[in-house]
Structures are given as structure tokens and as C-alpha cells.
Amino acid sequence: MASTPSLLRLALLLLGAVGRAGPRPQGTTVSLSETVQKWREYRRQCQRFLTEAPLLATGLFCNRTFDDYACWPDGPPGSFVNVSCPWYLPWASSVLQGHVYRFCTAEGLWLHKDNSSLPWRDLSECEESKRGERNFPEEQLLSLYIIYTVGYALSFSALVIASAILVGFRHLHCTRNYIHLNLFASFILRALSVFIKDAALKWMYSTAAQQHQWDGLLSYQDSLGCRLVFLLMQYCVAANYYWLLVEGVYLYTLLAFSVFSEQRIFKLYLSIGWGVPLLFVIPWGIVKYLYEDEGCWTRNSNMNYWLIIRLPILFAIGVNFLIFIRVICIVVSKLKANLMCKTDIKCRLAKSTLTLIPLLGTHEVIFAFVMDEHARGTLRFIKLFTELSFTSFQGLMVAILYCFVNNEVQMEFRKCWERWRLEHLNIQRDCSMKPLKCPTSSVSSGATVGSSVYAATCQSSYS
């Protein structure tokens, strides 16, 4: 008996890919639970056939069997045996004329795969990819999965380190860096939610499928915990977009207004970044529960419900893009006011533009208004590749630009290095003196003086 139904695994892969990539086109109505229920009915009919069908004449023949994919009759030795594509497949209507094949050897045994205990099967006529343009080969989906998993892992690690740096250095505590820290937190939560979501999908569409734990799989899909995982992911993604919007608004405020209350405006930013996403994620969850309570909420049969989340995110992307254009105009005017040559202006403008793109998420505009139900074939793959690759590595770029290459952060590290070197030299110099001429109190005294001078220097540099 085969350990995993290959075509059913492709069906689950399709559902899993949709859960990772976004909403499902409205025309697709087959859910995982429906597929499993049809598979169970197919298995029941097959077991009845295996029991009631008359046996072949005496002699060698391959035994009838159900291999968790198709129902096979007795096979004459030395011949191919074919049966119609199983009708429980989500795409069965498009492969009505197709067949799946096995080979019965002359010894009366089903042919097995090389170096495997699994029987050989030819499923080419029943494969869903024959339908053409809507879905992608498993290799392409796997490559996308690897790319964004690596991206989120690198971003998560870099953002945790960057957050520790901004929190650890007292002189870096200011409104601007508090906003950066909240942006880092939103990227970290987004990465964590993606990891948790992928772990849930891996169990549902891989482990449970391979072990045929259909009851456990369906009960998990219908559980509150599974839905909360995807609801949390939607909130983390939305909060990330709105903290990017906060960064854009704060940058524009610095350039356009000379005087404003940072403490008061920071409270407003907190409300926008963490509060506004609740205003549309919670209603979306309520609508899903009332009108589209299917499975684990990984797919959207009615795209109008998905717009409850999509439109506010498009609004944030659009506003940030307008801020990006406005900031570039301000940068150009300031560069021209400094009477710089055209070459220098172009170089600095290019540098500013490339820096602002990841910081404001401007790349999202490329495919932001190409709805998932309208993207097909190559366009959909390009859209998925662009969004998943850029978004997953965006946190890494933000950590680098806002922290690792920041002049203030580098200055703090240089001061720490200088202080450590000064204290180390004092200890070496004191230890080289004779004990009778150098009391132990002078060591602490010298270190205190060095530290106080460093502290005064730090305070003056930040005053």
C-alpha cells in the first residue's frame, strides 16, 4: 500500500500554497474537507468492489487492491493495468478521459519502484498540472518556500540583534529609535507568524496526509486554535504595513515641520501602528466566522470578504508611495539648493531612492493593485516571487539601514571600544607598578576618572 496518495498530496500542496500566497480565486470552490470526504466515499466503494467482484481464473495474477489513490482490479501477469482517474480529485472534471497505470509482472506481483517498497504508478494523465496556467509545478512552489523562509530567518535574526542594540545603548533612546523598535517588532512578529503558519500547514498538508490522519486533520482545521493562527498572521502582516506607514509619516513630518511635540505624536503613532489593524482584522475574522467558516480560513471563496483586509493595506501602501515621491522631491530641492553638480545630485538621489525603497516598502506598489483573482500563469508566479522574496528580506534591509550602518550606533560602539581600551590600559599600567608604590585604591580611582571623562564626553556629544 502506498504511504501517500500522490495526487491527493498535490491537491493538499495546492491548498497549502494558496494559504501561503494569499487569497484563492473566487471560482475555486473545492475545500480540503470536501476532498477528503470524497476520498472516503471512493475508498468505501472500492472496498465493496474488492469484496464483491468475481475472481479471475486460476493461475498467477496480481491481487486487487486499494493503494490510497486508486482502486485496482486483479491484473493478468505481464501486462499493464489501467483504471480511470479517481473522481474524488478536485480537478476530476478536467481529466475524465485520463487513466492511471500499473504493471503486473510475469510473477503475478505488482511492479515496484526501484529501491523502494512502493508500487510503480503512472499518474501523468491524471495530474492537475495538465490544466495549464493556474498552478505551478511543485518545484517552483518549493523554491519560493525556500527563498522566503531563508529571508524571514535572516530578517528575524538581524532584527533581534538590532533591537538589542537600540535598547542596550542608553544614548540611543529617543522617539525616532522608539519608532524603529516598533517597526522591528512588527517585522519580528510577522516572521514568527509566518513560521507558525508554515508549521501548521506542514502538519496539515504533509504529516497528517502521509499518516492518513484525516479525522485529526479535519478536526484541527475546524478548531479555534488553527483559525487563531491565521487570524494572528493577518494582524501581524497588517501591523507591519502600518508601522511602515508610521515611518513614512514620521520622516515626512521631520522634513516638512520644524516644530512638533514628539511625545504626543509618538502616542498617536502607537495607536496607528498597533491599533488601526485591529479595526479591520477583527471585523474580517467576524465575517469569516459568520459567512465563510470553512476549514482553517486559509482560502477565500468570496473575494469581497478578503477586501476587508486588503483595502486598508492598499491604503497604507498608497500613502507611503505618495510620501516616497514627496520626500524624493524635497531631497532634489535640497541638493539643488546646495549648488552641487549634476553628477553628484544624481548619485545622491539614487542613493536616497534605493535607501527609501525598503524603509517605506515602496516595492509593494509594483503588484499592489494586481488582485490575486486576476493574476494567472506567469504573471501570478512573478507576483508571488516578487512579493515573497522582497518582503521576506525587507526586515534584514531595515535592520541594516536603521541600525548596523547608522552613524550614531557606530559611534556608540566606537566609544565602548575606546572605554574598554582605556580601562584595559589603566589596568596593565597599574599592574606593572610596584605594589608598595601603587595602592589598590588607585586602580579604582584611575578607572573612575577615565569613566567619568568618557561619560562627560558622551553627554556633551548628545547635548
UniProtKB/Swiss-Prot annotation:
Keyword set, alphabetical order: ADP-ribosylation, Cell membrane, Disulfide bond, G-protein coupled receptor, Glycoprotein, Membrane, Receptor, Signal, Transducer, Transmembrane, Transmembrane helix
Family matches, as CDD domains: 7tmB1_GLP1R
Coiled coil: none
Tissue expression from the record: Detected in pancreatic islets (at protein level). Detected in pancreatic islets and lungs.
InterPro entries on file: GLP1R_7TM, GPCR_2, GPCR_2-like_7TM, GPCR_2_extracell_dom_sf, GPCR_2_extracellular_dom, GPCR_2_GLP1/glucagon_rcpt, GPCR_2_GLP1_rcpt, GPCR_2_secretin-like
A molecular-function term among this protein's GO annotations: signaling receptor activity
Modifications after synthesis and translation: N-glycosylation enhances cell surface expression and lengthens receptor half-life by preventing degradation in the ER.
GO annotation (BP), single: adenylate cyclase-activating G protein-coupled receptor signaling pathway
Any one annotated GO CC term: plasma membrane
Pfam families: 7tm_2, HRM
Further comment found in the protein's record: Selective recognition of glucagon-like peptide over glucagon is determined by residues located at the C-terminal end of the glucagon-like peptide.
Function: G-protein coupled receptor for glucagon-like peptide 1 (GLP-1). Ligand binding triggers activation of a signaling cascade that leads to the activation of adenylyl cyclase and increased intracellular cAMP levels. Plays a role in regulating insulin secretion in response to GLP-1.
Protein name: Glucagon-like peptide 1 receptor
Encoding gene, per UniProt annotation: Glp1r
